[in-house]
Amino acid sequence: MTNRIEMMIPLLLYFFFIMGIALWGNKKTKDKTGTSGFMEEYFLGSRSMGGFVLAMAIITTYTSASSFIGGPGVAYKVGLGWILLSMIQVPTAFLTLGVLGKRFAVIARRTNAVTITDFLRARYKSDAVVILASLALLIFFMASMLAQFIGGARLFESITGYSYQMGLLIFGLTVIMYTTIGGFRAVVLTDTIQGIMMLLASTAILVAVITAGGGVANIMSSLQAIDPGLLTPQGAGGSIPKPFILSFWVLVGFGILGLPQTTQKCLGFKDTKSMQSAMIIGTFTVGFTMLTMHLVGALGRAVVPGIEIGDLAIPTITLKLMSPFWAGIFIAGPLAAIMSTVDSMLIMCSAAIVKDLYFHYVARNDETKLPPRKVRLMSLSVTGIVGVLVFFAAMEPPSLLVWINLFAFGGLESVFFCPTLFGLYWRRANAMGAILSMTAGCAAFFFFNISKISVAGTTAIVPTLVIAAAVFIAGSLLSKDNTNDAELHKIFDF
């Protein structure tokens, strides 16, 4: 009992600190007058992110339970090869901001875009594109949040010894409350704190593993004795074939350009200098976190052998090597990764309902029909309701948790990748191409996953994006040419 209390103290202090930031963010939203002013503040923080905050917001939104629990768990099983594979994720911030950042930000300011759907509306001038994007975002985000809620509660349960329901209650209600109260500004500031917690936690547990193992050389000798395959790029038992590496490059490499939760951050930074510094800081942060946590998993097998379930590797290693108080500080790291993913998705779900659907199609962009007080109440209510729905769904966790998360992220990429990228850089891109690509991409992703059909040994995301791109290009070329649209030229600088 004493150990539990000692473990909970740093966690509770951390949660209270986050709630304080949310209350400060809430005060900022009250300072904004007018419907548009409130929505820009609540959903985008008035485009005020500096470089460090922007870097942390992108990286912490991208990283999740898999970065701290799932990935290191696989590294525990297959060895150093998985660390090499995880490094594919290092350019996340550099790629997102380098390819999308400045162009996205300029267009967003010209069109007053607050969400990714606002951008799609301005680019394609199609209600079908907007509605498809909003529905896909809501469905896949809620599925992904469900997986994150369950992952957070199970992590809490495995380390503290409290029940799954208690973990879900503490974790779930905390993230729902601070996101609902504080909006985007609270989200990015808590993401910054959570990014720092992730760095500290990953460093602490790696030092503990190396110390307990008697140094890196000794640990490597132990891994060699367990299975020489643990030290090879192909992994134990040749479990990392080349087609899988290609698939990983697509899914967590350039495929991230199709994830709305990361591209949304491109709309909110302050200036070009902030973007450039974020590219450097973000690249270092994700590289350091991925390297340290996956090293913990791979090296941990020599220090704490015999863990049968990969997902239990990090919690078990933490409990074996750290005191209750420091274990409590460590758990804040992966919980921070999960919370920072959920909070961004919550705020974007609220924006999709209030800004993209209700304000545009019901209020017809008329601020008199949606005055500041009403939009404030509606935004806070929708954020809270979406969070509570996911919370109750997580009370009885489904057994197919891995598939839910896979469908969510792959589904988002299949829907948003082509309309976003082609919309920014290809003059001929039009609504027909976007509609066909979104529907065909989503259908293809589900087909390849359900049928288990593999193309040249790759996973579903590779043929899915090829099909989505081919359909987008064909649909755009075979339909009306809008390249001479004067308004389009003015907005997109073609």
Regions found by a protein language model. Give the residues of each.
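Membrane-embedded helix-loop-helix hairpins and adjacent transmembrane boundary segments
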Residues: M1-F494
